[in-house]
Amino acid sequence: MKKIIFAFIILFVFLLPMIIFYQPWVNALPSTPRHASPEQLEKTVRYLTQTVHPRSADNIDNLNRSAEYIKEVFVSSGARVTSQDVPITGGPYKNIVADYGPADGPLIIIGAHYDSASSYENDQLTYTPGADDNASGVAGLLELARLLHQQVPKTGVQLVAYASEEPPGDDANLLI
């Protein structure tokens, strides 16, 4: 009987650590996160509101720099990228379009405008940085592009950065 008890004690002493410290095999997490990067969102908003500010209709060079930045991000995300001239006085303004997934079938369109407003206050022209109207929307659009690069959708997705939502254009609905 003592031998049986001793055998159980030895077995228990060896099995207990194995039971306590046993870790099941798990797959490694993907090397790239599948969520939006707060740092990248902030970087894009800062670029649009500080580096290429103002982005209003009377600052076509900054609008073009913004469009190039957006286009570069779309291209690096593996999208089929096109630009569309928007026929508005004072332009040409450009919509930047990125297509993901199948070219045929249903299409989900998500957009944000990259121009910002200007106005006259006390007979002086003022420019808004446009962080919440709509640099933050463009930042979200570009992060979505990065995420779509990681997992190609089964339904067509079109991301559109509009150039002329603010006056004098007010024509973000002009997707040609």
Feature locations, PLM:
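Acidic/histidine-rich catalytic neighborhood of metal-dependent amide-processing enzymes
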Residues: 128-176
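Soluble periplasmic/extracytoplasmic beta-strand elements of cell-envelope proteins
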Residues: 47, 95-99, 107-113, 156-162
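Glycine/charged-rich beta-loop-alpha catalytic/anionic-binding loops adjacent to active sites
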Residues: 106, 117-127
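Solvent-exposed, acidic/flexible segments
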Residues: 34-41, 56-67, 91, 107, ...
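Hydrophobic membrane-insertion alpha-helices, especially the h-region
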Residues: 4-21
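N-terminal capping segment at the start of a domain
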Residues: 18-65, 77
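A non-catalytic alpha/beta surface segment that caps or lines the substrate-entry region
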Residues: 47-103
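Solvent-exposed loop/turn segments at secondary-structure junctions
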Residues: 87-89, 102-104, 114-118, 164-168
